């Protein structure tokens, strides 16, 4: 795949073409209905949650400490897609670098689960309807997009939290998209 060190050389069509060719397009989900978007669809906005309120989940801020440059590059790349902007939800004590852009808006949420669910955040920021579609994407997918556009290579690694009552040695584990949890646990 082609690499783009200079983000200003990108266009919406070039971003979409590269996401489709690499297979990363399938990382996006529509709201309502949580479907992979059609290639010619255009969302009003894209939402990314950096809040982990569900029990036993990986803390996005912990993960992003190692990947913040790729995440921010990926944010700039996907900001070419929506009609309006990309919304990032964080906790009020989020302490990593943020991008200053007219196309990227940050929102703070605190509280118990389900505050970390992107659907809850969409409802509070910009509710969807039958006539208004937005997309969502996972923060690790944004990192993958950043790496793809920076380096031209597809990195399908994932960090997962292996924990719970059936796990004798809880840990964070590096794996690949599609790995069988029963085989690695």
What does each model-found stretch correspond to?
Residues 1-183:
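Buried, small/hydrophobic-residue-enriched core segments of structured protein domains
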């Amino acid at each position: 795949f082609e690499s783009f060190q200079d983000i200003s050389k990108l266009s919406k069509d070039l971003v979409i073409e590269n996401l489709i060719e690499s297979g990363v397009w399938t990382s996006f989900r529509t709201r309502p209905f949580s479907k992979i978007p059609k290639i010619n669809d255009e969302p009003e906005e894209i939402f990314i949650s950096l809040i982990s309120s569900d029990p036993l989940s990986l803390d996005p801020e912990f993960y992003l400490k190692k990947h913040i440059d790729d995440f921010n590059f990926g944010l700039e790349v996907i900001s070419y897609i929506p009609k309006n902007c990309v919304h990032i939800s964080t906790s009020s004590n989020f302490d990593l670098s943020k991008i200053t852009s007219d196309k990227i808006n940050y929102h703070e949420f605190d509280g118990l689960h389900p505050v970390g669910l992107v659907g809850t955040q969409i409802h509070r920021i910009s509710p969807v309807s039958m006539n208004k579609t937005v997309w969502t994407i996972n923060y690790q997918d944004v990192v993958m997009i950043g790496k793809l556009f920076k380096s031209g290579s597809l990195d399908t690694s994932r960090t997962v939290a292996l924990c719970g009552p059936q796990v004798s040695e809880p840990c964070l584990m590096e794996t690949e998209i599609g790995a069988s949890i029963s085989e690695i646990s």
